Amino acid sequence: MIKNSYINEKLNFYQKSFLTCMLLIVIVIVYFFSKNYLDKPKNSYVHTKMMTFLTNSNELNISKNLIWTKKTISGNLMSLKLAKVYVINNQLEKALKILEKSKNNSVDLNFFNLISFKIAQIYFQKNNIKKAITTIKDILGDSWDSIRNNFIGDVYFKLDNQKRAVTLWKRSIIQNKKIEFEKIIQMKINNYN
């Protein structure tokens, strides 16, 4: 009788352990599936909103008018939004045209630098490396040195000059004291090595 109770207790322990493990596995699976399921509508919502903006000619004309005629921060913001819509829809020339105009109308140095950076990214995406480097060098101010060096490092990496890229990325880490930025750049360097 004592042996039987010991076996039953042992069996109950294994059954409980098995059920606990299965329950944890089910919870993890449900968590990851629900997370992916919830992320998709958000992305499709953003895409739908951008497409609506692009196809709504009245809103588009108001935005373009604001960009072309006014030298204001709201015009700069609108140009960034419109350029993002064009880039998402792979209309890079239109995005460049909008950003170039906004860059010329920029009233704030940081907006000028941000718009220059976005223009350089588009040239980089179009594989126009010389224009990308020329544009990124238009960025003024010491506070942008880290971003500039990181981007130029990416350009050199694409040109198969990995040593120069790593040097620029390391310089970028030194110039930017943020831990998150350092981790991202360190991942680039580690992937090279």
Swiss-Prot record:
Q: Which UniProt keywords apply?
A: Cell membrane, Chaperone, Membrane, Transmembrane, Transmembrane helix
Which one of the record's GO molecular function terms can you name? protein-containing complex binding
**Where does the secretion signal sit in this chain?**
none
Matching SUPFAM superfamilies:
TPR-like
> What InterPro entries would the database entry show?
SecYEG/CpoB_TPR (IPR018704), TPR-like_helical_dom_sf (IPR011990), YfgM (IPR026039)
Query: What family does the database annotate?
Result: Belongs to the YfgM family.
Question: What PANTHER family does the database record attribute to this sequence?
Answer: ANCILLARY SECYEG TRANSLOCON SUBUNIT, UPF0070 PROTEIN YFGM
Its protein name is Ancillary SecYEG translocon subunit
Q: Tell me what organism the protein belongs to.
A: Buchnera aphidicola subsp. Baizongia pistaciae (strain Bp)
